[in-house]
Amino acid sequence: VRLARRGRLFDLARARGERDLLGAGLERTFMNLRSLPLLAGALVFGIPAFSSAQDMAIKPKTAAEAKAFTDKAEKELFLLANAFSRADWVKSTHITDDTEAIAAEANQRFTDAAVAAAKKAATFDGVKADPETLRKLKLLKVALVTPAPTGSKESAEVTTLAARLEGMYGKGKYVRKGKDGKEESLDLGELSNILATSRDPKEMEEAWTGWHSIARPMKKDFLRFVELQNKGARQLGFKDTGALWRSKYDMAPDAFAKEVDRLWDQVKPLYLSLHAYVRKRLRETYGPDVVPEKGPIPAHLLGNMWAQQWGNIEPLVAPKDADPGFDLTARLKEKKVDELEMVRFGERFFMSLGFAPLPKTFWERSLFVKPKDREVVCHASAWDVDNDNDLRIKMCIEVNAEDFVTIHHELGHNFYQRAYNQKPFLFRDSANDGFHEAIGDTIALSITPSYLKQVGLIDQEPPASKDIGLLLRMALDKIAFLPFGLLVDQYRWKIFSGEVTPAQFNRAWWDLRLKYQGIAPPNARSEDDFDAAAKYHVA
C-alpha cells in the first residue's frame, strides 16, 4: 500500500515520509535548465515529441541500443530530477505563488523527459538484453506517478495543478472566534493537537470540521488533475493512472489489487477486535449519546485528524493495570529536550548501529521547527536532495512522544537513501515503495523501554508485567493504520478508473471508511464537501 509515499522516482515525491523523497542538485544545473524548451525531454531521448509508438518501433532493437538508451536516460533524468528537487524543497518550505510556479516549471521539465523516456523504453519490449538493462527499461515505463499528457500546454497544467493543490493544503487554516472573542487562525498542527489532547467531544468536532472545510475548494483542481493524469497514463498504454501505479510491484495490476485484499483479510479479525474494544472504552468515557453500542465510531474521537492512528487515546482505552510505567512526552519536557536534540537522539540511534553521522549539511538545511514568518508544508518527510548525500528532513516538530518516534522513522528513510546512493540513478530507490516504509517502521518499533533507558530518557525499564500497555499502544498506532492505508489507495484507484464519479466523491470516501475502518463522520456531510482531500496523500 503506497499511502505513506505519494510517489516514487518520477514524481520525485517519493520517500518524503511522506514522507517523500526529493532531491536537488548542482546549483548551476537549475539555472541552465531554466532555458531549456519545455519539450526538451523528447528531444534529449532522440524521438520527436509527437511520434507514435508505431513510428518508433519500425525496426527491431538490439541489446546494445537498449543499454545506450538507458545510460543516456539516466544521465539526463538525474540532472532534471536534481533541478526539480531543489525547486520543490524551496516551495515546500516557503509556500508562495512564485515558489509554486518555479517548482511547477522544474517538475514539468522533468515530467516531459520522463514521459518521453517511458515511451521510448516501450519500443524495446522483447529485446534480449542483460538483466540490469531490462530492469531499467521496466522502471522507465512504470515509475511515473504523475503521468502528464504529451504536449507542453497540458504538461504544464499538470505540474501547475500539483503545486497548487499542495500549496492549498499547506496553507490551510480554520478561522474561529477565540475565548477572548477575537478571531484566531488555526493550522493543521494546532487542530490536530486539539484532537490529540482534548476530551470535549464538541471541541474535537469543531476542530475536525474546521480542518475538513479547507478541502472544499480543491475539488475543481483535483478533477482536472485526475483527468490529465489519466490521459497521460493512457498514452503510456495503461487503462488509467491507478493501473499504472499498481504495475510497479512485479505482478499484474489486477493481481496486486487482489493480493492487497488477501493480506487485509488476514489482519481484519485482529482489527475488528481492536475496534470493538476501543468503541466499548470510548462509550464508557463519553456515554451512549456520543458513542453507539454497535456500529461505527465517530471519527473525531480517535485522537487523530484522520483516525489513522489511535495512540493519543491510549489513556482513555487502556486497562487500569496497563500503565507502561512512564510518560515519554513528560520525560522529554522534564529533561528539557528541544526539537533539535530529539533529532540528535535519532542520529545517535543509527550511529550505535554502525552508521556514519549525518552530513553537516543535514543540520544546516533541514526544517525542524515551523517558521513564524512563512507558510510551509508541515507534513513530515525525508529528503535526498541531490540523490547523493544532501539528506534533510522537513518537520514541524513538537516535543512529544509521537514526534520522537516519527523522527526515528524519517531518519530511517535518510539512512536508507544514503545506503543506495552509489547505485545507478534508476536504482536509487527501494525495490518498491513498501521497503522504504518498512525500514522506517522497523526502526520506530525499536523505540522500546530498553532503548529509552539506554539513552537516559527513563530511569528504569518497566517490568514485563507492564508490556500490555506498550503492546496496546503499538496496536493503536500500527494495527489501526492498516485499513486506512488500504482505503486511501482503494479510493484513488476507483476515482481513476471512473468507478467513483465526481458526484460521488464524498459519499464514496465515507463508504470506504465505514467498510474498512468502521468509522463515520461526526456530523452530516454532503457532496459540497471533499473530505478525502483533507488528507495530504489525496490532495
Descriptions of predicted regions:
Residues 402-418, 437-441:
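Active-site recognition of the HExxH zinc-binding catalytic motif
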Residues 337, 391-408:
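Short pre-active-site segment immediately N-terminal to the catalytic Zn-binding motif
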Residues 37-48:
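Bacterial N-terminal signal peptides
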Residues 17-30:
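Short, Lys/Arg-enriched N-terminal segments with co-localized hydrophobic residues
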Residues 256, 260-270, 430-463:
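Post-HExxH zinc-binding segment in Zn-dependent metallohydrolases
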Residues 183-190, 224-394, 461-474, 480:
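Active-site-proximal, well-structured secondary-structure segments within enzyme catalytic domains
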Residues 54-224, 242, 535-539:
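N-terminal helix-rich structural modules
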